[in-house]
């Protein structure tokens, strides 16, 4: 049979120097998977991920967030929002897909269909249909890397930019 352990509020787990906190968790001891439900939070170093629910595959170091809003906030208050985000707790790398939006500490907004965030290097990579909005500039590109430490953006090929003082 399957051996489950139920942990209720607030449930706390520690793995790879990462805390998993939630209201309720079901731990499948046989497969070493944790199903976290309601007010789910992952805390690693100074990166915080929040969402409605996740499945944590302990042996693969992988947290799969799914829900209406999944949010990643780094120590510099750059905020990435999506509905689908996978986070590797060993490598400290997030992968988002099916659309995402990042707002940096200065208010710039970057959107794309998919991308990654490496919390060790503070590098966001945006892939496919990338749009960047500032108070006066709009940039559209196929890919973009954004270094959160230096606030430097590097665009891929097929990049177009517009400037308007009234944006």
Positions of PLM-derived features:
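Structural signature for solvent-exposed beta-strand/loop edge elements and short helix-capping sites
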Residues: 1-167
């Amino acid at each position: 049979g399957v051996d489950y352990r139920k942990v209720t509020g607030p449930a706390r787990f520690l793995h790879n120097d990462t805390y998993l906190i939630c209201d309720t968790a079901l731990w499948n001891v046989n497969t070493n998977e944790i199903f976290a439900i309601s007010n789910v939070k992952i805390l690693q170093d100074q990166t915080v991920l929040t969402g409605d629910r996740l499945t944590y595959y302990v042996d693969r170091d992988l947290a799969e967030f799914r829900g209406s809003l999944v949010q990643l906030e780094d120590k510099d208050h750059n905020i990435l929002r999506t509905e689908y985000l996978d986070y590797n707790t060993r490598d400290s790398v997030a992968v988002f897909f099916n659309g995402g939006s990042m707002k940096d500490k200065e208010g710039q907004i970057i959107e794309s269909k998919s991308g990654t965030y490496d919390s060790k290097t503070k590098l966001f990579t945006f892939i496919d249909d990338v749009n960047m909005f500032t108070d006066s500039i709009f940039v559209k590109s196929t890919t973009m890397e954004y270094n959160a430490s230096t606030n430097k953006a590097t665009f891929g090929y097929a990049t177009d930019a517009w400037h308007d003082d009234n944006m």
